[in-house]
Each structure stands twice: as C-alpha cells, then as structure tokens.
Design a protein with these regions (language model features):
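Glycan-processing catalytic domains of CAZymes
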Residues: 1-212
C-alpha cells in the first residue's frame, strides 16, 4: 500500500477445515460477536464439520468441508476474515460456498456471517469496505433480488482444440463455465446489474497430472 495505495489485496477462506484449528485460541472478541460468554478454549474441528460423516475427510484425512450452519464454523470464518481485514486486506474469496451450504440451502447462516464481516469492515477496513467473492457453479446466490457477493469468480475452463496442441479457447456453454451465467440483482454496495461482474482464473488447479 505504500507503493500503491489503490491496490486491493485479497485473502481467502476456503472450503476446507483441518484439525489444525484445534490449536487456534478463540479471541474474546469472537465470542462476543456471537453473544457468547468468552472462554479459555481453542476452536474445535469436530464442531465445524458436517454431522453423520458427510463430506468428512473430503480432502484428505482430518481435512473436511466445513458446515456453515454450525456456530463454530461461523465463528471461524469471522475470525479469519477479521484477521485479514486487520492486516489491511480489502477483499476476501470464500471458495466453493455451495458445498458448505448443504444444511443452509436458504443461506441464512451464510448471509449472517457475511453481514458480520461487512459490518466489521465498515468500521475497521482501510476504506471501510471489503469486497467478497466466491466460486458459484450455479451462477450466483441471490435472495429476494439481493446478491450475496460483490463479484463472482470461477475457473476459466479452457477448452482444448482437437488437433491443435497447446491451444485452447474460452467458450460459452462449455463444461460449467460461468460465461453468460453470472446472476444479477442488487449488490451489497447497493447498485443493480443484470449480470454481476466476475473474475475467471487462468490457473486454478496448478499443474496437470496428465501433461500433454
């Protein structure tokens, strides 16, 4: 920011939770945000995962998809977002939201935690705002005409060209690409659009396991 004060730095809170969270103390401010009595304890991995084994160990052993309907998960997301904002970051990517909402289909809990994060940013962020985005294979999350995110994001989904090695195109309708599918509505900032602007990621997955 000293070199370029207009730069927006982005952090992320992804669709993964590991047992490492058991080593992170919960600050009193996080308890208080959720109207809970502050206590001397760490975050609890088992209180964040889906019950009945759903999406548990989804990524690898002791690395699961968090369940946003659980208070502990909401506390974790608020805690990480707060740390990003306190560090001067002004944008947060929330990963694959639509695999963290299996028990929150109306996104009541997602909207609640997003509202808490935005409220904190309004008081503490560099420019009193945080821009939030996520991967949205559905095209976007909209309730009562209101978009949940400031922008959408998705992998670019390049389509290989038969007989033309090393060449690819970005094609509307190919695979689950977002082109032409980004939902519109009223943004968190209050302006309206027919299709929310989005980011496409050139390299979302790293190197291929079947190069060539």
């Amino acid at each position: 920011h000293k070199m370029d004060p207009d730069v927006i730095l982005q952090g992320a809170i992804f669709e993964i939770i590991t047992t490492d969270v058991n080593n992170v103390p919960i600050p009193a401010s996080v308890f208080e945000e959720f109207d809970l009595m502050p206590g001397n304890r760490n975050f609890n991995y088992k209180k964040m995962i889906y019950p009945f084994g759903r999406r548990v160990n989804h990524w690898h052993k002791d690395a699961s998809v968090p369940d946003m309907s659980r208070t502990e998960t909401k506390m974790w997301f608020f805690y990480v977002a707060k740390r990003w904002i306190d560090m001067g970051l002004e944008a947060i990517h929330f990963g694959q939201v639509e695999i963290m909402d299996d028990r929150d289909r109306n996104h009541i809990h997602w909207r609640d935690v997003m509202a808490r994060i935005r409220s904190y940013a309004k008081k503490h962020a560099r420019r009193s705002i945080v821009l939030c985005d996520a991967h949205v294979p559905s095209g976007g999350i909209v309730h009562d005409g209101k978009l949940m995110f400031d922008l959408h994001s998705f992998p670019s989904r390049p389509k290989s060209l038969k007989g033309q090695p090393h060449k690819a195109i970005l094609e509307k309708g190919f695979s689950d690409s977002i082109y032409g599918r980004s939902a519109g509505g009223v943004t968190p900032s209050g302006w309206s659009c027919e299709s929310l602007p989005y980011i496409v990621e050139i390299d979302n997955f790293g190197n291929s396991d079947h190069a060539g």
